[in-house]
């Protein structure tokens, strides 16, 4: 994750009475089994927001507003508890599968579950704030990370994330 580097870079904002609010894109490489939802190389965007009295409600409302704005409509979103080492509590946001709406047990995108994990998020762990020399007794914040490829996949009905790296011009030229 990039959040500690971002927190260090912008922590002076807090001394000026301003929040830390940053969105950072990056290229990610992972050792993953490849399928319609997973690729070993992809683009990710991470976001952090730190200020006084930031809470889980702020996190969920911010992400729901972003998703509604990006997709242009209110979405059926599921927020589940999850584990990420740098946030506590942590959550996983999932969207209702736009390809089968949970009605196809053979759906390659949601595996018949009806939901597609879209992003991970949570409240920044106090130890992460301390490592960035931010007092966790005075400040709280949230962080999230989302694959850009998956955002685009869901928006444009692309059933296989591997198309992005395929180099096929007929696929790429439609955008």
Predicted regions and their residues:
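TRNA-recognition modules of translation machinery and tRNA-sensing kinases, especially anticodon-binding
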Residues: 1-175
